[in-house]
UniProtKB/Swiss-Prot annotation:
Protein name (database record): Flotillin-like protein FloA
Membrane topology category: Multi-pass membrane protein
InterPro entries according to UniProt: FloA
Superkingdom as given in the UniProt entry: Bacteria
Membrane-spanning ranges: 6-26, 27-47
Length: 329
């Protein structure tokens, strides 16, 4: 009986220990104690109840303690519950402390929650980053297109990381400055001879205002001549003028053809009126004979004159045709 009770008690103790070890990270608690970080088991149990991973809070806390940072469990747990990257923020604080950069934990946490890589920002403050722009094209006053590529050396401005514009804004502003500087050059050779003028002009405009960076230098890496935009525009304009002139000429030709057809129609109309009038002559002659306005003798004289006129016209027509067919001497 005694042995059975002992076995039951032993099983209960073992099960209780297994439950305890599975719910409370004893190994993590021992590691914290060994590192000099005093964390109560109750604190670890509370993290479990608040659905916080103890390792993601205690491990960065140990790292911060070893680096000499005075951080608390509540600070790290609050940042974790807010959705931040606790380990990244602690690494950024350690890097800032080593580089003698004033970066409180609250500011680092705010930068992290804003979606910025706070560790990269600290590293960029110590080691400036070089941003290379693509080829940016501008047209000088003489119509030649010039393409330039720039290297922008920037340093992160930690004070403006929250709410400040990013790299895309820096590239866009520098590109705008390059286009403006090339466009104000009277000749493209000025850009080729003095590319540093672009750097000086662009750098003097304070393009880093409102951004999360401080521009240290702008260097022109490459300058190329592209094409003669002015000549291309003149060619396109000449082609457009030619097409317009051709369209207007076609319009005038169509109007002339329409006018010609209209005149032919009017000629036919007049000819019809003449034929109609001629058809009324015999009737008028008959009426004149009946009324005695003309005599029969006058009528035959008129017919003789018409026949004589017709014969003369026929002779003249044959003469003209023979003259046209005779060879030239």
């Amino acid at each position: 009986m005694f042995s059975l009770s002992f076995i039951v008690i032993a099983v209960i103790i073992i099960v209780a220990l297994l439950i305890l070890f599975s719910f409370v990270p004893i190994g993590l608690w021992i590691s914290a104690l060994a590192a000099g970080v005093h964390v109560g088991i109750g604190t670890l149990v509370g993290m479990r109840l608040r659905r916080v991973s103890p390792r993601k809070v205690i491990a960065p806390l140990i790292k911060a303690h070893k680096a000499g940072l005075a951080l608390t469990t509540n600070q790290l747990e609050s940042h974790y519950l807010a959705g931040g990257n606790v380990d990244r923020v602690v690494d950024a604080n350690i890097a800032a402390q080593r580089a003698d950069i004033d970066l409180p934990f609250e500011r680092a946490a705010a930068i992290d929650l804003a979606g910025r890589d706070v560790l990269e920002a600290v590293q960029m403050s110590v080691n400036p980053k070089v941003i290379e722009t693509p080829f940016i094209a501008g047209v000088a006053m003489n119509g030649i297109e010039v393409k330039a590529k720039a290297r922008i050396t920037v340093r992160a401005n930690i004070a403006r990381l929250v709410g400040g514009a990013g790299e895309e804004t820096i590239i866009a502003r520098v590109g705008e400055g390059i286009v403006s500087t090339i466009g104000s050059s009277k000749h493209h050779t000025e850009v080729l001879e003095n590319p540093d003028n672009i750097s000086k002009t662009v750098l003097s405009k304070g393009l880093d205002s409102g951004t999360a960076f401080e521009i240290l230098s702008i260097d022109i890496a490459d300058v190329d001549i592209s094409k003669n935009i002015g000549a291309d525009l003149q060619t396109e304009q000449a082609l457009a003028d030619k097409n317009i002139a051709q369209a207007k000429a076609e319009e005038r030709r169509a109007m002339a053809v329409a006018t010609e057809q209209e005149m032919k129609a009017r000629v036919q109309e007049m000819h019809a009126k003449v034929v109609e009038a001629e058809s009324e002559v015999p009737l008028a002659m008959a009426e004149a004979l009946r009324s005695g306005n003309i005599s029969v003798k006058d009528y035959y004289n008129l017919k003789n004159i018409e026949a004589d006129t017709g014969m003369r016209n026929a002779i003249n027509k044959r003469t003209d045709q023979s003259d046209d067919e005779s060879p030239e001497h």
